[in-house]
C-alpha cells in the first residue's frame, strides 16, 4: 500500500516538475483574470490622504518635517480605525518606522491606511506612505507603519467586529497580525530582558577624547500646553501631535551634538502609557544617548501634569530616534563621540549600544526578503523574539497565499505546489478524525516524533526558550545512498488560536548554536520554513495542513521531498536530501484518524 502511494506521488511530482512552465503560464492567466474581476474591490476600512507639501511644513533642509508627517499618519490611521469601530478611537502605539526617502516642497504625500485585524477592543492599522513628484510623475516609497488603536465608548464596553480578509495581501496581514500583537504585549519585558542579557563591551577608554562632546550639552527640555487645536473630538491630545513634539526636541538634541541639521532615519516604537487632555502641560525631555560612527540615538520621554502645583508627573510616552547627518551627496557623515555622564548616562550609553544590535538583528531577520536570509540564523537572547516571530509569520504568510496549484490527490490527501523565484513550496492537507487540541499536543512536542515518524531517529531538547518556543537537536537515519546520518538544530514555535477560525500553528526553522556545531559523524541539514497548521472543522474533526519550502534546483535534481525537514547539507547545493518517499509520510499522516493521545507517554498509539 505504502509503495503504491509512493509511486503515485512520485509520478505526480514528476508531472509537477515537467509541466512547470505550462502551470506558470496558466497561473499568470488566472491571476490576470482574478485581477480583472477584482478591479472594483476596495477594503471598506481603507482611508486615503493626499497632502501637498508647502514651505510651512518643512524643516531647515527644505524637506517635509517628520513631525508633520507623523501627524498626517496618525490622523489617517485613526480615521481608518474609527471607520471600522464606528466609535472614537485613540492611539495606543506606533511600531518601529524606517524612513527610506525624504520629501521636498512641492511634492505630494500619499498616505493609505486600512485595518489589518480587529481584536476585542483594539485593532492593528497598516499604513503606507509614498511621495509623488507632480512634474516628473515619479513616485517613491517613504515608509510603512503599523499602529494600534483602541476603541472607546463612554457607556458600553466595546466589542469590535472581526475583519474578513478577501485579497491575498489582506489574508497575509490578517494572519500575521496576531503574532505582531503578541510581540507588542511583551515589548517592555522583552527589551528589559535583552538589555540585561546582552553583554555590550564599553569602548569609552579607546575613543579620542579630543572629539568627544559631553552628553549633558545635548540635553533639551521643553514644555507644551495642550490647547483645543491639539486635541481630537474627545478632548484627548492627538497621538500624532505628541509624536511631532517629541521629534522636535529630539532634533534639537541631535543638532547640539553634530552642529548641523540632522535627518531622522528611524523611530523605535511609540508606546502611549496614558492619556493626555486639553489643559495638560507636557514636559518633553531629550538627550543623545550614544553616537556611533555614522548615526546617533536620541532618547525622548514625555511627562504630563495638570496644574503647576502638582508634584507628581505622569509618564505618558517614550521613544528612541536614530539620526544621521547627510553630506551634499546624501551620504552619512562621521559624527563626534559622546561622553556620557557617570551613572544614568553610562547606563543609557550601553543600553543604546544594545538597542542598536537589537535593531540590526531585527532588520536582518524580519525585514529581509526570504531569498536574502540564510537557511540557518544564529540564535542568541538578543534576537530570540524576532526569530520566533519570523518563524511563525513566514509559515502563516505561506499558508495564506491563494495561488497554490493542486498537483495530486490520493485517498483524500491533497498535495499543492507553489513555485516562486528559486523556491518550490509544498502544501499537503487532509481532514483527520481527532480533536484539534490533541493533534496540536502530539505534533508540537518534537520529542515524541520518533515514536510515530521513522524519519526522526532521536530528538533532544536543547533549550526551552519560553512556554511556546523550544530548540531541538534532531537526528535522522542515513537515507538516499548516504553513509552518514543527518542532524538538524531546529527552532520550534507553537501558537494556539488567537480567535475563532485561527489555526493551531507549529512552525519549524533551522538555527545555529555554539553548543551544537557540525560534527564529523553527521551531515548537517537545514530547513528554511516548514510546519503544521491545524483548523478545528467540527467535533473530533481537524483539517491538518503541512507546509514546507524547498530550493527548486534541489527538488528538480532529486525528485524527492521530506515530511518534516527539508534539508540541504551545508556547502553542497546539489546534495543533502533525505530521499524520503512520500508514501511513508502520507501513511503517517493518515494514521492520525485511528490514533489517540496516550495520556502517559504523549505519543501516537494505534487503537
UniProtKB/Swiss-Prot annotation:
Induction: By cold exposure and repressed by heat exposure.
CDD domains: BFIT_BACH, START_STARD14-like
InterPro entries: Cytosol_ACT (IPR040170), HOTDOG_ACOT (IPR033120), HotDog_dom_sf (IPR029069), START-like_dom_sf (IPR023393), START_lipid-bd_dom (IPR002913), Thioestr_dom (IPR006683)
Enzyme class: hydrolase
GO biological process, alphabetically ordered: acyl-CoA metabolic process; fatty acid metabolic process; intracellular signal transduction; negative regulation of cold-induced thermogenesis; response to cold; response to temperature stimulus
Keywords: Cytoplasm, Fatty acid metabolism, Hydrolase, Lipid metabolism, Mitochondrion, Phosphoprotein, Repeat, Serine esterase, Transit peptide
One cellular component (GO) term of this entry: cytosol
Enzyme Commission number(s) from the entry: 3.1.2.-, 3.1.2.2
Domain HotDog ACOT-type: 43-155, 216-329
Domain START: 375-585
Coiled coil: none
Pathway(s) this gene product operates in, as recorded in its UniProt entry: Lipid metabolism; fatty acid metabolism
Major localization class: mitochondrion
Reaction(s) catalysed by this chain's protein: hexadecanoyl-CoA + H2O = hexadecanoate + CoA + H(+); tetradecanoyl-CoA + H2O = tetradecanoate + CoA + H(+); dodecanoyl-CoA + H2O = dodecanoate + CoA + H(+); butanoyl-CoA + H2O = butanoate + CoA + H(+)
List of residues binding CoA: 91-93, 120-122, 181, 271-273
Subcellular location: Mitochondrion matrix; Cytoplasm
GO molecular function, one term: fatty acyl-CoA hydrolase activity
Function comment: Has an acyl-CoA thioesterase activity with a preference for the long chain fatty acyl-CoA thioesters hexadecanoyl-CoA/palmitoyl-CoA and tetradecanoyl-CoA/myristoyl-CoA which are the main substrates in the mitochondrial beta-oxidation pathway.
Protein's name in the database: Acyl-coenzyme A thioesterase 11
Organism: Homo sapiens
